[in-house]
């Protein structure tokens, strides 16, 4: 996969579609195809954004199981290829994704979960007057890294509760930005292998959850310019010593990524956007 961008482009992409000014000088550029597509639809500023972040669903497992990932592309048809970051472990990846900065700048370079002190996407959103919600499995990286900000945190027992809470937030329509995190595929990957039947079953459940969230977004946010994203953090490979799934090294199976984005114009109400 030939690409110079990393998952760090997520932060500036979200800010760009919201019309928020550039942040720190070291932040990675937005994904140009996403911003260009928004402008081609006449969307200068989105009013709502939902990002769904399933753990460890890399490019290669998507390529191996197109029938599984297919419903995601139907709901979010703009596919952007990119790299993860080294080492491709969850806290390093999500710290990069939601600061726009490399590990050398945000400071997380191994598997650890401190509260980040640098500027994050969520700080920029709040500064721009956006109402932010983060829904994640309790004590996961996303649940812990971005604490101590004026955002709404929802820590849930596991993926099904995350989905239900996220749907409730979308239907209530009181937040401009919602981040939703799932982890079952990664959990099973480590117990089995990235393409084991049990792991692919978890991947199917992630896809089904994304479809439910997309349907909720369409129902609740249909009058608003909006963006929907399927944004995993890294992939996985088989450890030759254990025969089980793992990740954390600079190998294509861990590093090659693709994200899925959907941008939609709001429906008009009496000639104006509600």
PLM segments and residue spans:
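Feature captures the catalytic ectodomains and active-site-proximal regions of enzymes
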Residues: 1-274
